[in-house]
Amino acid sequence: MDCKVHMETTVSRPVLSPTHINATASETFTVLQQRMRIVEEQTSSLRDDLIMLDFGEKRGYLEAPDCLEDLDSQKVISPIQNEAICAGKTDILWKNCEFLVNRMCRLESLMQSLKMNIFRLQTEKDLNPQKTAFLKDRLNAIQEEHSKDLKLLHLEVMNLRQQLRAVKEEEDKAQDEVQRLTATLKIASQTKKNAAIIEEELKTTKRKMNLKIQELRRQLAQEKYLRESLEKSASAMLLKIQEMGSTVEVERKQVHILQQNCIALRDSIQSAQELLAQEQKKKEELEIATSQLKSDLTSRDDLISKLVEENKNLQISFNKEHEENAYLRSEIMSLHEASEKAQVLNDQLTKKCSELSCMLQTVTMEKARIIADHQAILQVEQKMMTQTFQEQNLLLDAAHASITNELQTVQNEKTQLQAHLDHLILEHNQCIQKAQDAEKRTAVQKELLESTIARLRGELEASMQEKKSLLEEKERFQREVNKTEKEIVQERCNLEKELAKNKVDINTLTHNLQTLEEENKHLADQMASLELQQVTSDYHGLAQQKVEKITESKNKLAYENGKLQIKVKQLEEQVQSFTDTSLQNDHLRKMNKYLQTKYAQANSELSAKRVHLQQADAHLKEVKSILERSKEELSRTVKCRNAALKESQKLKEDLEAVEDRENKKVGNFQRQLAEAKEDNCKVTIMLENVLASHSKMQGALEKVQIELGRRDSEIAGLKKERDLNQQRVQKLEAEVDQWQARMLVMEDQHNSEIESLQKALGVAREDNRKLAMSLEQALQTNNHLQTKLDHIQEQLESKELERQNLETFKDRMTEESKVEAELHAERIEALRKQFQTERETTKKVAQREVAELKKALDEANFRSVEVSRTNRELRQKLAELEKILESNKEKIKNQKTQIKLHLSAKANNAQNIERMKQIEKELKQMELIKDQYQKKNYEQSLSIQRFVCEMTNLQKEMQMLAKSQYDASVRNKQQELHLEAERKIRQELENRCQELEETVRHLKKCKEATENTLKEASVESEQITANLEEAHRWFKHRFDGLQLELTKNRLQRPSGEDRWQEKDQDVKHDVMSNQSVLHRWERKQNLRPMPKKYHSEVQRK
């Protein structure tokens, strides 16, 4: 009885839970290990007791399997792998510890129940030695049932192991995929950052390109201005040539007047013979002077012959240069086709020429009036000649000295002109070489640009294809997401249906429970009646059998209940993890939608940028049309130049004819003078000397007047040009101000666009950060699931160990029971005698125990019903959780496919980034080429500024020369009053001959200078056109690739029509500004060769 009371106290003691103790993980582990050792010792002792109770016939059930023979050699699995545990894992660890502690408490309670049963069996054997055979049969039946249950459990454990392995493999795969996803997300964020940087760099390059285009426009305006100035200078040259023709006609008239004067002089000679008698003394002195003048004339004739020979040599060289000019003209004819388009400018020039012709007519009228006044003055002077005859002898010496100085100056000019010609020939050769080098460079650059354009087009096509593939993948992802959502909804509906079914099952189970309780009551009544009827021994045996069945069923139910509770907890944790993953998936879907909206916004911004690029293409096309117009204008100017050259050739021929006529006239005059010499001898010689001196003075006066007229006309033209230039400068300044205002507006718009893009980039970065946070959360959940899996695996391994221990214990118990059965067979015979004596005492005890057993039966039945109900619920939950696992596996597979597609898209993005880098390198190379071109243009502008400075200096020198010539003219007038009439006539004839020769030389030199300037202008225009063509080709090839996409986006944006109208107005304004730039450039090109021409003219004067 004392032992019985002790067992009841052990069964009824409360189970201690470890959650009330604030212990560490290591302490809990040691406590659990100690308890496990105690349990193992107790199981070994129970096995020995079973062997003693004759369970030795079937030892195979209690033998340990081969896998558990070396338990000591196996390592103990610790539930704590690392002491440094994250804050999120501590709760899981403590839950696992609590679970293990509860399990150990259950095992202890089970062991205590086993001890009580063994004690009861021992007492029964001691009290009933006759029932050993019955007990052996019962034990064998129990062992068979137990072995069957163990086999079933073993199969379930194997299935669970396989499932756990599959789950573990899938979770490992999921971890790898999550790591890949994190890596891909990081790379995607980096690619987005790189794309943002690339966009900013492209914007900066676009700004630079706009600035460079504006600089080119300014340069074109300057070059247009220069071209206009060159055209004006060419028109001035034509006017000068016309003036020279008019002077030649005037000189012809003067020669006719001189002939008439000669006739009048012959008449006056007859009247002068009467005066010769009085002036014989003066004649002797004059004869001495004439002898000196004859010697001077002979020396002059020699010089004239030398100059004629040099003139012939110059004509030969001129013919050679003429041939070269013909070759150049053949080359220039290719430009005539482009010059046909410049008729508008020619119309303007014709208007200006008509105005200038009107001015010329007025000037000729004034000149005729001046000549009439001059003739009147000459008549007055002829009257005064008789009075000033004595003073002319002194002035002749001064004239002789001045003539010698003039000859020296002529020789110096000749040497300078030859050096200048050599220098021009060298420059011409250098220009030809430069043109050839430039053509080669342009060909090479053209090939490079074509290759780069072809490669860029290929890359554009590839990027478009990649874009299409990405859009298709995006649609596929959306479809898969929709499918998963539908599946989740269907699963929820199925779960709700299963819950309803479970509720119905629970109601049926409760009804069955009630029926079982009623049956138990009925059985209890039957048991009471059987006790009265049957013998106490038979009743005692049946009661014992029923009690044993009840206890065994109770133990089995408790064991299964523990297992099922563990499985339920595990499955609930898995369900929670899957719910977390589903929530994360929902969050990711939301993020995907948000990113899709961002992608649409980025596409719209790209379309806007493409529209801007199309506008830039339109601007470039307009610039190209302006350049073509400028080429046409150039061709027209070249035609005008050729016409001017033809007119200069005609004038040259006319001048040669005039020279021939004048030479003939001079010969006739010489013959007439020879006849006069034969008739009048010395008197005629003296008269001829007087006429020569008078002619020289008159020629000097005419020269001075002509030069003064030219200077006045040049000064007036320069003043007009200055006024026109000032007006154009003002217009250009106004245009510059307008362009600056437009630039400011464009910069503001551009800045606003950049700010919007920066905001969009900031939002995209925040989205990327949110994605990174969500991925980190997913990783944390994945780690949490891994820890749970590890814990489950450890629990399974511990369960397997326990199962193996139980199998070994069962085998041992069977062996011991067999041994004990043999021993009890011997004891039973001895105990039968004792049993008869003790039967009466046991009847009383049995009655008490039957009452207690009835109570225990009622409780056991109630508990068995509850346990069966919970088992069914747990099995249903298991089935549901297995379905959820399968659905989650399918979702994981879908996510894997999505990850693979994302990785492929990422690889394509990396390839696109590499291509963008290559394009950036090529753009940098093109920018370097542009910088070189800008440097060259800057050097040209510096040379133009130097030329302008030289022009101002030359104008100052011309003013000084005009003043000095005016003073010389005043002195010459004073000297002419004192010269004799005969010397004037002779000097006039000689000076006219020299002037004609000088005019011929001057015209030749002007022609050479104009041809050289035209050559230089043509070479420079070719260089500039080549450079502009290169720049245009580059811009055209750069923006042709994007034009198709821009036209597509134009149709999608009808709101941009107003912008196009505004931009068309801007384009028109740009055309006008570009025309002004071309005029400036033409003026610069015309002004470059001017300093040499002016220098030579100054030296001649």
Swiss-Prot record:
Keywords, comma-separated and alphabetical: Coiled coil
Coiled coil among the record's keywords?
Answer: yes
Q: Which domain of life is it from?
A: Eukaryota
Coiled-coil portions = 106-299, 398-680, 712-940, 970-1033
Q: Which InterPro entries match?
A: CCDC150 (IPR038807)
Annotated region (Disordered), positions in chain: 1055-1101
**Sequence ranges of Basic and acidic residues compositional bias:** 1055-1071
Q: Has UniProt tagged this entry with the keyword Coiled coil?
A: yes
Disulfide bonds listed in the record: none
Q: Which PANTHER family does the record associate with it?
A: COILED-COIL DOMAIN-CONTAINING PROTEIN 150
Q: What is this protein called?
A: Coiled-coil domain-containing protein 150
